[in-house]
Amino acid sequence: MKRGKKYLESLKLYDKTQQYSSDEAIDIVLKTAKANFDETIDLAVRLGVDPRHADQQVRGTVVLPHGTGKSVKVLVFAKGEKAKEAEAAGADYVGAEELVAKIQNENWFDYDVVVATPDMMGAVGRLGKILGPKGLMPNPKSGTVTFDLEKAIKEIKAGKIEYRVDKAGIIHVPIGKKSFGKEKLLENFRAVMDAIIKSKPAAAKGQYIKSLVLSSTMGPGVKVNPLKIF
């Protein structure tokens, strides 16, 4: 893959083989984010788990102290009074079977998070093969199947994100935008890492946090020393 001039210049700013403290790594990532738009800062965490085993799955949610910097569109499946509650709480789309049909018939994906009341899951379940592969299926573990719609919607809008380990044993999450600056990014990073560490499965053996890499949308990866997160 051919790399651009800015990317290659960024590589000269630090030692790609070295592991840095979280503080130093964010400094470097901000210096290497040279694109002419507000780049997202991403975190990739390789875990010492085998995701093929059900007892070594790692997933959860965390509210980023400073949000993601992205405006999040929320779709809610609810009826009656619960639909009114969702609208009042700021949901972007609210409906029931008619929205299930719209997604089935139109392949409609103009939303980032899907929330449903438990009584709607019979209908929403029909969308499993459509929403599942995109990570959009409502799930009680992530707080997106609930009758407390006001709380769920407000948390999501405030910067609640879901994380889950992929087949390769890696968690990918955004921790904010370049424009946040160092302190806010550092606080978001540490909130995510605190949540991931607390999600360690009892069945995981050996070193849990194998490696950490921070990067901007267009920039190179910067390694973080797992012993220098906090």
Swiss-Prot record:
PANTHER family: 54S RIBOSOMAL PROTEIN L1, MITOCHONDRIAL, LARGE RIBOSOMAL SUBUNIT PROTEIN UL1M. Gene3D superfamilies: 3.30.190.20, 3.40.50.790. GO terms for biological process: regulation of translation; translation. GO terms for molecular function: rRNA binding; structural constituent of ribosome; tRNA binding. InterPro entries: Ribosom_uL1_bac-type (IPR005878), Ribosomal_uL1 (IPR002143), Ribosomal_uL1-like (IPR023674), Ribosomal_uL1/biogenesis (IPR028364), Ribosomal_uL1_3-a/b-sand (IPR016095), Ribosomal_uL1_CS (IPR023673). This is Large ribosomal subunit protein uL1. Binds directly to 23S rRNA. The L1 stalk is quite mobile in the ribosome, and is involved in E site tRNA release. Protein L1 is also a translational repressor protein, it controls the translation of the L11 operon by binding to its mRNA. GO terms for cellular component: large ribosomal subunit. Keywords: Repressor, Ribonucleoprotein, Ribosomal protein, RNA-binding, rRNA-binding, Translation regulation, tRNA-binding. Belongs to the universal ribosomal protein uL1 family. It holds the Pfam family Ribosomal_L1. Part of the 50S ribosomal subunit. PROSITE patterns: RIBOSOMAL_L1.
